[in-house]
Amino acid sequence: LYELANISNSDIKLLINSFNTLADDFDIIIIDTSAGISKNVTSFITSSNETIVITTPEPGALADAYAIIKISREFCDKIHVVVNKADNYKEANRTMEKLSRSAKKFLNMQLNYLGFVLEDETVHKANMEQVAFFVNYPNSLASKCLMDIGRKLVYGEPLLPKTNVTLNNWFTRLESILKAN
């Protein structure tokens, strides 16, 4: 991700062409930009029409999430939130409440809560095995949480709004933003 966060202008065209190829086969592309804000991570955010912010209950993670939300609100139609590594349902909800209160008070905006993923040893175990926890441990707590989030995305409101925004439009916006930086 370091390389992606600091991509050169010469590699931007290659990246955009790769994304354009994907756009022929997929309606949605999710890009994991990791924590923190670099110039090119910000470019991905500003070219998106929706953002899914994934945070943990730790104060530093909440500060990073708030910063992403603050940038995203100017460019995204919707900002979704997932609380990751929560010890329990109450901790996840408290975390979301803190973030929601701050967004409402200081940014005058509502966040869409997609759900939470509980802290689960099978995630660490799967990482050590270099496999997806969802595949090898489909009945784990984390997998069940992920299924709930997936159901909300699939059966709830569509992730991409019903507008004329297409992936090809997005790639064009991304390319112009990255070149400008």
Which residue stretches match the model-derived regions?
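NTP-binding/hydrolysis catalytic cores, primarily Walker-type P-loop NTPases
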Residues: A132-N181
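G-domain G4 guanine-recognition motif of GTPases
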Residues: T56-P57, I79-R94, F116-V123, N136-P138
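Inter-motif core of Ras-like GTPase G domains
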Residues: I16-D25, S38-G60
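Beta-strand-loop-alpha "switch" segments that mediate conformational coupling across diverse proteins
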Residues: L107-F134, C145-D148
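P-loop/Walker-type NTP enzyme "switch/lid" segment
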Residues: L1-D24, N127-E129
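Conserved C-terminal guanine-recognition region of P-loop GTPase G domains, centered on the G4
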Residues: I16-F19, L62-K78
